[in-house]
Amino acid sequence: MVHVRAKDAVGQYGERVAVRRLTEAGMTVLDRNWRCRSGEIDVVARDGDCLVVCEVKTRRSVSAGTALEAVTPQKLARLRRLTGEWLAAHPGVNPPRVRLDVVAVTVPERGPATVQHVAGVS
């Protein structure tokens, strides 16, 4: 029997919601949960000629801060390094532009999740 912690289940749900939002916006998802020794990229997508590396943050409430507030400058620096590693691991992908996005998902006790997509965070 596989046991999934509640926090992990919420995170997985948030990633599914984020992927649905990105595809509804016309993006093509190229990779999910890509891992290397340095870390993990939640979602890699293509938006026209732009490669989009997306951090997904999911919260059950905002009492400890919003999901967007959890994306620190250090987290963005790590995401930039991981983007370089992803591109090195995928030599056939040569996008003219690369963008870092954040999708923040809040999953309340009741009601639908709220989703905020911030394109081009720096």
UniProtKB/Swiss-Prot annotation:
HAMAP family assigned to the protein according to its UniProt record, in alphabetical order: UPF0102
InterPro entries assigned to the protein according to its UniProt record, in alphabetical order: Restrct_endonuc-II-like, tRNA_endonuc-like_dom_sf, UPF0102_YraN-like
One Pfam family recorded for the sequence: UPF0102
Family: Belongs to the UPF0102 family.
Molecular functions per Gene Ontology: nucleic acid binding
Top-rank taxon: Bacteria
Protein known as: UPF0102 protein Krad_1407
